[in-house]
Every structure is written in structure tokens, then in C-alpha cells.
């Protein structure tokens, strides 16, 4: 039988019965707009829950930098860590140590091995994202030709899973598409621009660059838009509408899609509260009712994902020149 649990805002349970949350939000890198948008959702949830929240953004996109933030959060008395992981396995020892000290760990955006957290809040099914990237690349390439990938780091859990599913979908559905290379821009604009330029120079027949990263897609689209490759090489992937608006509307043919990033952070924080204050089950099969501030689904079923148990945020929105002005994040 399914186990029914619920998200809880601070007004549901008596204040005396609720554990006061102290939440450390640790993104992959503190300066990335995507994670700053997610933090707005974390802060919105914290206001509802009367929780203490802090954005603990690392200055480097490495596992080592996140381990420092994890350890510092534990030492400072935080009882919740919301984490977008830079590495699937390297963070687990520090996270297990945190859990032994009573810290609840919820991952979102990019997961760790299940031993390091309670549950993963996934933006969408990894297979669905990979398939959508393949479909977009095929559309822009006209169903055949060379395409390349511009990712973040070689160790990025979520990007690696999406790319794997994308490659499988291309092999099965688009045999005339050829993925010629995967480059890594480290989620830094300068490095991503350099890698974009390198891909175009090395592969003169390149038709599409797929960038499943909010930093990489902007760097690639900006470079292509201002180069002789405009109208010849097309960029698609995952990006914020405010960042991609110019390139979607300027005739360079860029595409982008993304989920509600602000709500992403909100849901992750509310899941943590449910685990702590409602003893919510996050085992596969549990049905989690959404809190009133959730802008997505009315309930979410905990499912088995690529790594372990996960909660799906909801479907992504494809941003086009016709709808991109309707979004502001």
C-alpha cells in the first residue's frame, strides 16, 4: 500500500511541537544565477516555516569546496543541508558524517549516492530530459549531421546522466546524427566560450551544440550569435529564460528549456521539513502532498530514479520567441 505523507508549512503543526529548522543551502557554485534563483525558493519556504536559512555557495565548482561547506554547516549547528552535488561519490563520507550527527540531507538538481542523503528532488525524469535534448538537437540539425555537447565538469552527476540518455535516444531514434565530442566549460563563462570556439573550429561541419547547463548554454549562444557561425551552428539545452531571451529572439535559432527553478528550491526545503517534523516517508512508493505554496503538482510520488529514491519537480517549459517574455527568472 502507498504511504501518504505531506509537506507542512509552519502553521500546520503546533509551534511547540515543531523542530525549528536551520537550513544550509549548498549549490554547486554560489555565483551561478540558476542556483541563486533556486535559493529564492528556499528562502520563500524558510519564511513560511519560520526557519533560519543561509546560502552557502562555494567559490569553486569542486567536491572539495562543497565538503568544506558541509563540514562548516555541521559545525555551525545546521540541522538541514540542501545540496546540489558536484560529485556523486566524493561528498558521501562528509554527508554520512553529517547524518550521524542528526542532519537531514536533501539533494536537488544533482544527486549523490543514496547513502549520503534522504531523498533527491529531481527536476524531471533524467530519461525525459535526455530524450528532450536529443529531440531538440535533431530538430535543429534537420535529423542528420554532427552535433557536440558542452557540459559543466566531467564529474557532474546530473549532466552525465542526461547526456547518457541523450546519446541512447540519438542512437535509437536518430541514427544519422553523430555526437562528435563532449567538451567541459566548468560552468564558467570564459571557459565555456573557449570550449564553444574550439568545437566550432575543430568540427567545421558542426550543426548543433547541446549545452545542458545554464552557464554553458548562454556562453555558447552568445558566441554563436556574434560570429560567422550564426545561422549555421545552433545552440540548444537548458537555460534560464532571462539569460537566453536575447538569443532566442535575435534570429540565431537558439532554443532553451527549463523547469521552475524558484519552485525547485521551495520544494526541496519543504521536503526536508516534512521528513523532520512529520516523519514523512520518502521511500519509493510514498505519495507526498504538496504544500500550499508549491506552484507545481498537487502531490508527488516518490519514485525510483537513476541513482535512488527521488521526487520529480514537474515538466519543463520550452522557451520560444513567442513565450519567453512571459517568464522572469
Question: Residue locations for each model-derived region?
Answer:
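Short, low-complexity disordered leader/linker segments with a strong preference
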Residues: 1-22, 96-101
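Periplasmic-binding protein-like
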Residues: 24-25, 77-85, 104-108, 148-149, ...
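Hydrophobic alpha-helical segments within soluble ligand-binding/sensing domains
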Residues: 66, 121-147, 161, 191-193, ...
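Hinge/cleft segment of the Venus flytrap/periplasmic-binding protein
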Residues: 19, 154-158, 169-173, 271-329
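Flexible loop/hinge segments that line or gate small-molecule binding clefts
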Residues: 52, 89-128, 139, 146, ...
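Hydrophobic alpha-helical
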Residues: 83-100, 166, 185-247
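Short, solvent-exposed amphipathic alpha-helices that sit
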Residues: 34-49, 129-133, 157-177, 191, ...
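Extracytoplasmic "Venus flytrap"
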Residues: 21-45, 49, 53-70, 78, ...
Amino acid at each position: 500500500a502507498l504511504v501518504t505523507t505531506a509537506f507542512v508549512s509552519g502553521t500546520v503543526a503546533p509551534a511547540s511541537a515543531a523542530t525549528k529548522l536551520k537550513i544550509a543551502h549548498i549549490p554547486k557554485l554560489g555565483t551561478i544565477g540558476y542556483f541563486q534563483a533556486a535559493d529564492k525558493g528556499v528562502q520563500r519556504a524558510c519564511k513560511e516555516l519560520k526557519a533560519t536559512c543561509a546560502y552557502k555557495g562555494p567559490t569553486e565548482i569542486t567536491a572539495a569546496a562543497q565538503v568544506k561547506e558541509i563540514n562548516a554547516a555541521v559545525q555551525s549547528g545546521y540541522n538541514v543541508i540542501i545540496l546540489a552535488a558536484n560529485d556523486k561519490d566524493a561528498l558521501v563520507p562528509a554527508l554520512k558524517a553529517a547524518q550521524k550527527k542528526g542532519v537531514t540531507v536533501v539533494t536537488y538538481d544533482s544527486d549523490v549516492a543514496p547513502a549520503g542523503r534522504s531523498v533527491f528532488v529531481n527536476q524531471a525524469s533524467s530519461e525525459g530530459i535526455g530524450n528532450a535534448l536529443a529531440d531538440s538537437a535533431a530538430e535543429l540539425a534537420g535529423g542528420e549531421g554532427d552535433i557536440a555537447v558542452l557540459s559543466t565538469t566531467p564529474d557532474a552527476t546530473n549532466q552525465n546522466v542526461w547526456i547518457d540518455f541523450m546519446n541512447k535516444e540519438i542512437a535509437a531514434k536518430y541514427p544519422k546524427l553523430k555526437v562528435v565530442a563532449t567538451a567541459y566549460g566548468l560552468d564558467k563563462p570564459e571557459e565555456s566560450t573557449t570550449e564553444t570556439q574550439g568545437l566550432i573550429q575543430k568540427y567545421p561541419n558542426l550543426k548543433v551544440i547541446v549545452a545542458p547547463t545554464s552557464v554553458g548554454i548562454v556562453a555558447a549562444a552568445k558566441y554563436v550569435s556574434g560570429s560567422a557561425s550564426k545561422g549555421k551552428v545552433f545552440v540548444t539545452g537548458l537555460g534560464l529564460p532571462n539569460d537566453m531571451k536575447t538569443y532566442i529572439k535575435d534570429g540565431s535559432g537558439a532554443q532553451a528549456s527549463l523547469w521552475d527553478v524558484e519552485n525547485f528550491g521551495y520544494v526541496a526545503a519543504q521536503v526536508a521539513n516534512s521528513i523532520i517534523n512529520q516523519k514523512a516517508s520518502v521511500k519509493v512508493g510514498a505519495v507526498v502532498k504538496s504544500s500550499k505554496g508549491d506552484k507545481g503538482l498537487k502531490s508527488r510520488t516518490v519514485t525510483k530514479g537513476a541513482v535512488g529514491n527521488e521526487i520529480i519537480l514537474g515538466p519543463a517549459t520550452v522557451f520560444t520567441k513567442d513565450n519567453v517574455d512571459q517568464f522572469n527568472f
